[in-house]
């Protein structure tokens, strides 16, 4: 029996067999799986992480005595294993809910996550409409993704399946194209009435449609939704003359690029890569029996804030991943200074008005309320923002600098400003993601950032040497 389970980032997954836990227990911070499902997930993770360095691993594996445990990191999405486990890993969103409000918290977390995911650049999730978000957040994430793929294929079919010339070789009773001499001799040496020919044929049995058919067949096997499976079977009738793809890697290479004749296939092919190749933004991959669609929340948060800044720009010029400056402009080559820019700077958001510049860098990390540990702010991030401040200074006027983090229970209001030197000031602000559930609140929240100005209070921030262990402890703290 297939079952859907949910856990949040930095949540801990354990085997039920190792703990005396009530069957009714529900929490996004902890998950207790039946032994068979836990072992299946554990083996899947171990296979993917065996040769990876600690910093590249998407899960932490540890033990308490003989009890194995799995801890999620800052990657979200869906994993499906061979034993029927569907695991949704959701972002850690700050809500004021009690433990009894599990279902409400789960629903609202998925609403926020799907909205953020729908703004992820260069991804198929861009077609998740706001109207669809309202109705789909109560469904399993995988089924939401499948339903969106189905919608894309229906659009293609309404316009008619595309055809293109494909290379064919057949033994015919008439001459068509050109004779393949070696094959003609092999097959027709005693039958001069036939010709083994190579020719081009205009057919819908071509690579785009083959990839879509392969995807539909896979989704029909893994979907748990009667509605989705019924829709898939209806769509497959339109692909009866089409064969399955025999080489996914080769076929996806063939459909790469921007072929204007197949623009209406672009979104569907992106989804096909997600489902057939587990192509998200990670190197955590499945196989024929397992599937993993995982995304780094750092990237999702960055793109979502960039989207909001553009949406509520109000006359500001907004650039995301701005590439105007390099850290190094010149080098001494053969004793002569030459323009050889190196180390391009790419702040997440640059907002410009007539006489002011605002540089925003987003960080998906849980800050603390402890000045002793620098609140969990990375020293390298402080250096990075200092470099932005120096490079984006225009006519001796420094830009406003903002480090933006998700709001959490220990970080609910902006920290006192950090003074680098002169008028170069850094603000560290929380962003309340639950405001995305209400358009007016969302606009107010992003405008707090866009209209941020230096406060009058001065906080003497002193950089202390930080070791990675201390930073990791802050980032992975259970909330």
Region annotations inferred by a language model:
Residues 1-49, 288-479:
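Catalytic core segments in nucleotide and nucleic-acid processing enzymes
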Residues 2-285, 290-291:
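Residue(s) in the substrate-gating loop at a strand-loop-helix junction
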């Amino acid at each position: 029996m297939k079952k859907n389970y949910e856990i949040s980032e930095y949540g801990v997954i354990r085997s039920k067999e190792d703990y005396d836990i009530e069957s009714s227990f529900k929490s996004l911070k902890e998950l207790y799986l039946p032994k068979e499902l836990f072992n299946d997930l554990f083996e899947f993770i171990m296979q993917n992480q065996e040769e990876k360095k600690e910093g590249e691993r998407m899960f932490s594996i540890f033990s308490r005595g003989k009890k194995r445990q799995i801890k999620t990191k800052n990657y979200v999405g869906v994993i499906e294993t061979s034993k029927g486990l569907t695991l949704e890993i959701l972002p850690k969103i700050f809500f004021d809910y009690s433990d009894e409000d599990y279902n409400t918290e789960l629903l609202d977390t998925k609403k926020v996550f799907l909205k953020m995911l729908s703004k992820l650049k260069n991804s198929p999730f861009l077609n998740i409409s706001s109207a669809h978000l309202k109705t789909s957040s109560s469904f399993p994430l995988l089924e939401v993704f499948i339903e969106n793929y189905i919608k894309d294929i229906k659009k293609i079919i309404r316009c008619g399946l595309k055809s293109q010339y494909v290379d064919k070789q057949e033994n015919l009773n008439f001459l068509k194209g050109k004779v393949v001499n070696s094959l003609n001799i092999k097959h027709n040496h005693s039958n001069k009435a036939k010709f083994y020919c190579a020719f081009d044929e205009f057919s819908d049995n071509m690579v785009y449609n083959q990839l879509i058919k392969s995807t539909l067949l896979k989704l029909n096997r893994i979907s748990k939704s009667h509605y989705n499976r019924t829709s898939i079977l209806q769509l497959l009738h339109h692909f009866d003359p089409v064969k399955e793809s025999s080489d996914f890697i080769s076929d996806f290479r063939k459909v790469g690029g921007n072929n204007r004749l197949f623009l209406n296939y672009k979104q569907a092919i992106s989804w096909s890569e997600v489902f057939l190749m587990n192509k998200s933004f990670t190197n955590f991959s499945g196989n024929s029996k397992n599937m993993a669609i995982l995304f780094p929340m750092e990237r999702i948060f960055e793109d979502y804030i960039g989207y909001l800044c553009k949406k509520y720009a109000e006359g500001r010029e907004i650039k995301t991943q701005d590439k105007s400056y390099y850290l190094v402009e010149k080098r001494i080559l053969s004793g002569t200074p030459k323009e050889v820019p190196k180390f391009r700077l790419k702040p997440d958001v640059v907002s410009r008005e007539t006489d002011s510049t605002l540089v925003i860098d987003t960080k998906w990390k849980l800050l603390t309320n402890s000045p002793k540990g620098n609140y969990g702010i990375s020293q390298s991030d402080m250096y990075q923002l200092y470099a932005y401040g120096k490079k984006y200074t225009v006519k001796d006027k420094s830009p406003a600098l903002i480090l933006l983090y998700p709001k959490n229970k220990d970080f609910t209001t902006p920290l006192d400003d950090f003074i680098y030197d002169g008028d170069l000031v850094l603000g560290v602000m929380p962003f309340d993601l639950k405001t995305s559930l209400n358009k007016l609140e969302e606009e107010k929240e992003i405008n707090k950032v866009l209209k941020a100005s230096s406060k009058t209070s001065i906080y003497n921030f002193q950089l202390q040497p930080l070791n990675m262990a201390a930073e990791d402890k802050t980032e992975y703290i259970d909330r």
